[in-house]
Amino acid sequence: MSSKRNSLMLPLRIAIAGASGRMGRMLIEATLKEEGAVLASAFDRPGTTFIGRDAGELSGSATGILITDDPRAAIAAADCVIDFTRPEGTLAHLALARELGKAMVIGTTGFSTAEKEAIAAAAQAIPIVFAPNMAVGVNAVFKLLEVAARILDDGYDVEVIEAHHRFKVDAPSGTALRMGEVVACELGRDLETCAIYGREGVTGERKAETIGFSTIRGGDVVGDHTVLFAGIGERIEITHRSGSRMPYASGSLRAARFLAGRSSGLFDMQDVLGLR
């Protein structure tokens, strides 16, 4: 799909979905600074204020690339589309990427099980990196959680605490859920049956094999995640705090480069970073 482009050392052409959103703006800025990549297109929903305006307005410098409401044309102009929108939008863009034979990096969260299966099915035709968090630091934390869970085993209660800005629409965050999945897998548990999402009233004693989730929403918090291993007489906390969205954008571009030259397959950031 893009092996010829790579062999000729041409820059990787990037399309940004949801261009006027918080992540879209950061992705535009990161792409403009990225060596070996060019902003090929940027698109958003019809009626969005920035349609028809230069994508560079969102990052402070003119680019000559106008934000469009035509996703087909935008995706056709690129080698890879990066999408941090909403599940319904991402799935529509995925269908176009599959039809046009384009790679895709998906950072959207909040998918149902059936929607995740649709992404996996599309990956039989095109290469996809699908991950709840593209930041290198968060993915390092996933590995640390594997090690901690393996060492601590069943002797510690596990709680996942996450905080995000007031505008986030899904809870718990995809990153928090992935952290819970990592720990549950290492402990031989099924997160779907052992997860507890919030507590209220007279709950009784904590069941030993549960994994609890607590969600905070407020202000402009970019993203904080802590996994607490609470034992008798000691506690271990593994925390990641995001100060900006740039690590997500930089990781997404790294994922796009990883997909270059691949014809199909479903990958995550553990694959991109060689942590498998």
UniProtKB/Swiss-Prot annotation:
- Keywords assigned by UniProt, alphabetized: Amino-acid biosynthesis, Cytoplasm, Diaminopimelate biosynthesis, Lysine biosynthesis, NAD, NADP, Oxidoreductase
* CDD domains, per database record: DHDPR_N
Q: Which InterPro entries match?
A: DapB_C, DapB_N, DapB_N_CS, DHDPR_bac, NAD(P)-bd_dom_sf
Transferase in keyword set = no
What is this enzyme's catalytic activity, as reactions? (S)-2,3,4,5-tetrahydrodipicolinate + NAD(+) + H2O = (2S,4S)-4-hydroxy-2,3,4,5-tetrahydrodipicolinate + NADH + H(+); (S)-2,3,4,5-tetrahydrodipicolinate + NADP(+) + H2O = (2S,4S)-4-hydroxy-2,3,4,5-tetrahydrodipicolinate + NADPH + H(+)
An example Pfam family from this entry, by short name, is: DapB_C
UniProt name for this protein: 4-hydroxy-tetrahydrodipicolinate reductase
